[in-house]
Amino acid sequence: MKAVCLLSGGMDSSTLACLAKHDGYDILALHFSYGQRTEEKERECAKRIARHLNALEFLEVDLTYLKAVGASSLTDYAMQVKAHEDAGDGIPDTYVPFRNANLLSVATSFAEARGADAIYIGVQASDYSGYPDCRPEFIDAFQKVITLGTRPDAGIILKTPFVKLNKAEILKIGMDLNVPYEDTWSCYAENEVACGICGSCHYRLEAFRQIGIQDPIPYR
């Protein structure tokens, strides 16, 4: 069995890829460059995780048109990545408009071309409270798109094992799977030493605190 795993190099996607391997899949790692601030570090970490899993393939896809589209502090450097405490409610400014539809479209092409059985994406409970393209309803709808838009015998299943879990629960799974979290990166703002205050750093640090383990990456 083969699975395409969307692998950003972050905590969730790395745990996800390790879980897919544990589930018996050979890994086809798929990484995206879309002009995000921390792309250099993300790519480095994604490659390390792919090597850790003996991935069959590591495919990097350039989606820098999403940077040209703009409207996200991840890709528009004129916008500041806000501290978690300053972010407020509603859709965060780190939301990249309709990003997951773009990523999953490429993942579906890759999966169909390689004869993969599944696509793994690491959406989780704290994501869909703010990101509309992480909602379970969106994932269900995209499964229909995959089924209707691929060959009748493709049978590609979109898997979201973390969709009802919080970050601490995901981290517990990862610890059982011996995920090398020192080779992952979550910070939205920095490439060398994590800022510790952006939304992504906040939720990662909180997850480690909740299970009583020291996060192995450096913070300011």
Swiss-Prot record:
Metabolic or biological pathway: Purine metabolism; 7-cyano-7-deazaguanine biosynthesis
The keyword Metal-binding is assigned to this record: yes
Cofactor(s) needed by this chain: Zn(2+)
InterPro entries (alphabetical): QueC, Rossmann-like_a/b/a_fold
Binding site for ATP: L7, S8, G9, G10, M11, D12, S13, S14, T15, L16, A17
Keyword list, A-Z: ATP-binding, Ligase, Metal-binding, Nucleotide-binding, Zinc
A Pfam family recorded for this sequence: QueC
Catalytic activity: 7-carboxy-7-deazaguanine + NH4(+) + ATP = 7-cyano-7-deazaguanine + ADP + phosphate + H2O + H(+)
Keyword Magnesium: no
Cofactor note: Binds 1 zinc ion per subunit.
Binding site for Zn(2+): C187, C195, C198, C201
UniProt EC number: 6.3.4.20
MF (Gene Ontology): ATP binding; ligase activity, forming carbon-nitrogen bonds; zinc ion binding
Role description: Catalyzes the ATP-dependent conversion of 7-carboxy-7-deazaguanine (CDG) to 7-cyano-7-deazaguanine (preQ(0)).
Family: Belongs to the QueC family.
PANTHER family named among the record's database cross-references: 7-CYANO-7-DEAZAGUANINE SYNTHASE
Name of the protein: 7-cyano-7-deazaguanine synthase
Organism per entry: Methanospirillum hungatei JF-1 (strain ATCC 27890 / DSM 864 / NBRC 100397 / JF-1)
